Amino acid sequence: MLPPDPGQAGAVQPPQDPRPLLRLEVGRLRVRESRRLFDPSVHVGRLAGPRRSFVFRAQDRPVMDRGLRVEVMCSLLDEHEEDLAGTVAWLVRPGVPEVSDLDLEWQSAAGFAFATRELRPAGFYVVTRGGWLDVRTGESRVWKRLRL
């Protein structure tokens, strides 16, 4: 725990390393989703913790324009019952953890939705059955056999 900042009411929690939590998210996805192709979902909340989610069918992607993605992200933020500071957004999708157009589209929508609340997301990640990707930094991790 860091000492209190004079401009804040209480102590500041150090940022938590997201890598173990992302590993856990990959493991949970592998347990619940055995199919190679499944509908993507976007989440807002805490990795390996409380979250709000939206699942969209792959066949509906053509109608998911930027405005609708922003509305979905704003709605997820409105439904999130915890303090939004430190909140992350992540996309769960099939495929490999490499940057795709879908990732960038949802990252943009998340950034805009957070900005309307004068916040920045603590991270934007992609989780697949094979691993995870930090879309902002390009850091990723891939497993052939993940043991939790």
Predicted regions and their residues:
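N-terminal, charge-rich interaction modules
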Residues: M1-G49, V55
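Short, surface-exposed beta-edge/turn micro-motifs
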Residues: F38-S41, A85-G86, A122
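Short beta-strand segments
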Residues: G45, W90-V92, Y125-V127
